[in-house]
C-alpha cells in the first residue's frame, strides 16, 4: 500500500462517497443511541410512589446496550457512543470521516431520545431528565478522571471482545460490553452519574438546557477511549503467530 493510499484509507473518503450502506449505518447509530438514551434515562425518573435504585439504573443501561448491540451490530457495529467510535479510530478500525459521521448521528439520536422521554413524562416527574452531574465535593478534574477510568474499561472491553483475530472468545460480546457498562454505573454513578458516553450526557443536557460541566462528559470519556484504543493496539491486539492456548475458554 502506498503512503497516499494509506492516508486515504485512514481519512476514509471512500467510506462516505462509495459505501452504499453508509446511510443504513448512520440510521442504525441514530436509532441505537435514541433507544439507549430513551430507555436509559427513562429508568432515572422518580415518581411519587417510586424512586429508582442505583442497581436498577445500572442494569437498565447495561442491558439496553447489550440488546441493541445484538440488533444493530451487524449493520454499523452499534457503537452508539462517541468514545467507542474515537477509540476505534485510534486503532484504525474506523476511518476518520466515517467516525465523524457516526458521532453526529449519535448526538442527534441522543437529543431525540431525551426529547421523546421528556414529552412522554409528566412535568412533575421529569426532574433532571437524567442529566449527568458531578457529586458535591468532587472537582471537575476528579470528574474527568472518573469518567476516563470507567470509559477506558468499556472501550478496552469493546476492543477485546470484538477483535476478529481472536479465536478464543466463545461467549456473548454484547453481554460482556453491557456488563462493563453496568459495572461502571455500579462503581461510579455516585461520583459523576457514570456517563461513559458523551452522547448520553449531551442529549439530556440539550433538551433540558443544562450544560453545567458538560465538557467533563466529553473530555473524560474521549480521553479514556483514546487511551484504551492505543493501549489495546500497542500491547494486546492479536497478531499473526500469537499464542492463545492459555486464554480463558468461555
Swiss-Prot record:
It is a multi-pass membrane protein. Its main location: membrane. Residues 48-56, 121-137, 190-210 are extracellular. Keywords: Membrane, Repeat, Transmembrane, Transmembrane helix, Transport. One of its GO terms (molecular function) is channel activity. InterPro entries: Aquaporin-like (IPR023271), Aquaporin_transptr (IPR034294), MIP (IPR000425), MIP_CS (IPR022357). It is found in: Membrane. Residues 1-26, 78-99, 159-168, 232-250 are cytoplasmic. A motif (NPA 2) lies at residues 197-199. Pfam families: MIP. Gene3D superfamilies: Glycerol uptake facilitator protein (1.20.1080.10). The chain crosses the membrane at residues 27-47, 57-77, 100-120, 138-158, 169-189, 211-231. A motif (NPA 1) lies at residues 81-83. Forms a water-specific channel. Aquaporins contain two tandem repeats each containing three membrane-spanning domains and a pore-forming loop with the signature motif Asn-Pro-Ala (NPA). Homotetramer. This is Aquaporin AQPAn.G. It comes from Anopheles gambiae.
Amino acid at each position: 500500500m502506498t503512503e497516499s493510499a494509506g492516508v486515504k484509507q485512514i481519512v476514509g473518503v471512500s467510506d462516505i462517497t462509495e459505501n452504499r450502506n453508509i446511510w443504513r449505518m448512520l440510521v442504525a447509530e441514530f436509532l441505537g443511541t435514541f433507544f439507549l438514551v430513551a430507555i436509559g434515562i427513562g429508568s432515572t425518573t422518580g415518581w411519587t410512589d417510586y424512586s429508582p435504585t442505583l442497581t436498577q439504573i445500572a442494569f437498565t443501561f447495561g442491558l439496553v446496550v447489550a440488546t441493541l448491540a445484538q440488533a444493530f451490530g451487524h449493520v454499523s457495529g452499534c457503537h452508539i457512543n462517541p468514545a467507542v467510535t474515537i477509540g476505534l479510530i485510534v486503532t484504525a478500525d474506523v476511518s476518520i470521516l466515517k467516525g465523524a459521521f457516526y458521532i453526529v448521528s449519535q448526538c442527534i439520536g441522543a437529543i431525540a431520545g431525551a426529547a421523546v422521554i421528556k414529552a412522554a413524562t409528566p412535568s412533575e416527574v421529569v426532574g433532571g431528565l437524567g442529566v449527568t452531574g458531578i457529586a458535591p465535593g468532587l472537582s471537575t478534574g476528579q470528574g474527568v478522571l472518573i469518567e476516563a477510568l470507567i470509559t477506558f474499561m468499556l472501550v478496552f472491553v469493546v476492543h477485546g471482545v470484538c477483535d476478529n483475530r481472536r479465536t478464543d472468545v466463545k461467549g456473548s460480546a454484547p453481554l460482556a460490553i453491557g456488563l462493563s457498562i453496568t459495572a461502571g454505573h455500579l462503581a461510579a454513578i455516585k461520583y459523576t452519574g457514570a456517563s461513559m458516553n458523551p452522547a448520553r450526557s449531551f442529549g439530556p443536557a440539550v433538551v433540558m438546557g443544562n450544560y453545567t460541566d458538560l465538557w467533563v462528559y466529553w473530555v473524560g470519556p474521549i480521553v479514556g477511549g483514546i487511551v484504551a484504543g492505543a493501549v489495546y493496539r500497542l500491547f494486546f491486539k492479536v497478531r499473526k503467530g500469537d499464542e492463545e492456548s492459555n486464554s480463558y475458554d468461555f
